[in-house]
């Protein structure tokens, strides 16, 4: 019995050592790149029903930590700059779009909404301003045809908004640059409209809908859209690497998580269909996103596969990079803060290529 136990333990430690050795290039990449990604980063990789890689780096200098604490005090926030783990919560910016699109799809699954529904049916103010024929599908894919302001201006405008109704009234006044479905402009407006629609249908706040329909069943205990007057579906979520990984696992498993069907497989597949064809004019696409293939519902199509999209992703302004590779059967997330826009897409590609080579 003792001999069997000893052999089992030795085998376990030998396997662990080999696994650590195998992923050493990833450790080295994370250590090298973290100073360029805001000084703190977490990388998780999931394959074959388990986490196969988990590592974090904190490269903040003493001076950077002092500056961060001073800024936090000014903003009356609590901050821990000494630790950065898979359970550290940070704003994830446009990674929110993937979550919000999935939330909208829960209404599609229930038959309460169709992607072909026009928004004027639910929000008459948009019809009054000539925007009522925009569809829910176009809202989730940045194909509304609305010429939204630049990101900084858009966020500044949202600071003065006190209700979802006021946010939609503001969007209704924005100029149009093309017919719905003909122009791609990456912005916050489409997701904001979709968020207002599901609030209208349900009579509940966007934050509550997210908590009930996604956060709770996916055990995303530290993920939310804040407590501001108006939720920002396109970029207002805060999360942890561990929480967001649960969402990615659900997407990888065609809507299933822990034996529960959160989204239908059909909805997950619909979310991954590229809608930005050669006939669509690109009015604005962030350079750091590296527009190479297209955009679906709340997510970029990074790579084509044998059956449509192979890899889908939804990177955020602050540098976090979640992705799902359907053909290789894994998902991963790089969670970080303040990554520089220059060379960001190349860094994402380098990381994914390295991960692919190790799996």
Regions found by a protein language model. Give the residues of each.
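Catalytic loop of the DD-peptidase/beta-lactamase superfamily, centered on the K-T-G motif
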Residues: 20-57, 73, 158, 199-204, ...
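Bacterial Sec-dependent N-terminal signal peptides
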Residues: 1-21
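Catalytic tyrosine of NAD(P)H-dependent dehydrogenase/reductases that use a Tyr as the general acid/base
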Residues: 90-93, 184-186, 321
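Active-site helix/loop module of the DD-peptidase/beta-lactamase fold
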Residues: 86, 91-95, 109-147, 151, ...
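Short, charged, amphipathic alpha-helices and their helix-cap/turn boundaries
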Residues: 69-78, 155-179, 204-224
């Amino acid at each position: 019995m003792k001999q069997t136990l000893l052999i089992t333990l030795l085998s376990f430690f030998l396997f662990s050592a080999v696994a650590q050795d195998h992923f050493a290039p990833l450790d080295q990449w994370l250590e090298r790149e973290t100073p360029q990604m805001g000084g703190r980063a977490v990388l998780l990789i999931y394959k074959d029903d388990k986490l196969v890689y988990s590592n974090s780096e904190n490269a903040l200098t003493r001076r950077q930590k002092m500056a961060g604490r001073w800024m936090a005090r000014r903003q009356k926030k609590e901050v821990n700059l000494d630790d950065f783990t898979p359970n550290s919560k940070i704003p994830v910016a446009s990674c929110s779009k993937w979550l919000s699109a999935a939330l909208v799809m829960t209404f599609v699954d229930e038959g309460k909404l169709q992607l072909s529904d026009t928004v004027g049916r639910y929000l008459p103010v948009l019809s009054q301003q000539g925007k009522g024929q925009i569809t829910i599908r176009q809202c989730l894919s940045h194909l509304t045809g609305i010429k939204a302001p630049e990101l900084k201006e858009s966020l500044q405008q949202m600071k003065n908004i006190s209700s979802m109704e006021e946010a939609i009234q503001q969007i209704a006044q924005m100029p149009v640059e093309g017919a719905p479905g003909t122009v791609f402009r990456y912005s916050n407006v489409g997701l904001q409209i979709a968020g207002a629609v599901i609030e209208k249908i349900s009579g509940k706040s966007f934050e509550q809908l997210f908590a009930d329909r996604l956060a709770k069943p996916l055990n995303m205990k530290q993920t939310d859209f804040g407590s501001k007057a108006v939720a920002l579906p396109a970029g207002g979520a805060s999360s942890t690497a561990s929480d967001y990984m649960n969402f990615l696992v659900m997407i990888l498993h065609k809507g299933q998580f822990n034996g529960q069907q959160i989204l239908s497989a059909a909805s997950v597949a619909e979310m991954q269909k590229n809608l930005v064809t050669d006939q669509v004019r690109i009015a604005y696409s962030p350079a750091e996103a590296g527009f190479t293939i297209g955009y679906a519902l709340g997510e970029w199509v990074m790579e084509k596969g044998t059956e449509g999209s192979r890899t889908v992703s939804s990177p955020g302004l602050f540098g976090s990079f979640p992705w799902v590779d359907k053909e290789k059967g894994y998902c991963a997330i790089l969670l970080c803060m303040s990554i520089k826009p220059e060379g960001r897409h190349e860094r994402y590609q380098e990381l994914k290529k390295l991960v692919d080579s190790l799996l």
